[in-house]
């Protein structure tokens, strides 16, 4: 009896708010990857369980306090279900506990890709993108960055297997994303 063994590759996208994580995820989806946006998974739970007036970030913090630091990763893997994709992407990894949980649940073919943009560029993008949960005040954006860093996102970025710098035009960013994706798919 023989078994068909299919190896999937998993990309964990990390980066500060406004760095270009979602754009990278969109490009990966266009290449056929299954993409799960971690904040969407949290938002789904938030819509059911949040306390009145509770901010999304505070809700996520409370989830981690109750269920452990890897809870969002576990919820995302549950959301994945049975996937027949060769490449699975989790957009928005914020802590090493999440990275460890993904590796525990999905095996060793897990790669961290950090998207980096300078703060001035990120803040400009955030102010222009018009997401409902984005602040338009620089002081609030700086506070949000600090909250992300307290969660451990800086440690995840430091442990990245690949870093994509997003400080130029879209075509250059796309080229850099394609280069990293090809390297992950070819060699890991």
UniProtKB/Swiss-Prot annotation:
GO terms assigned for molecular function: ATP binding
Keywords: ATP-binding, Nucleotide-binding
InterPro entries xrefs: NTP_hydrolase-rel (IPR022970), P-loop_NTPase (IPR027417)
Positions of disulphide bridges: none
SUPFAM superfamilies: P-loop containing nucleoside triphosphate hydrolases
UniProt xrefs under CDD domains: DPCK (cd02022)
Binding site for ATP: 15-22
Family as reported in the entry's similarity comment: Belongs to the UPF0200 family.
PANTHER family: DEPHOSPHO-COA KINASE (PTHR41930:SF1), UPF0200 PROTEIN MJ1399 (PTHR41930)
Protein name: UPF0200 protein M164_1169
Organism field: Saccharolobus islandicus (strain M.16.4 / Kamchatka #3)
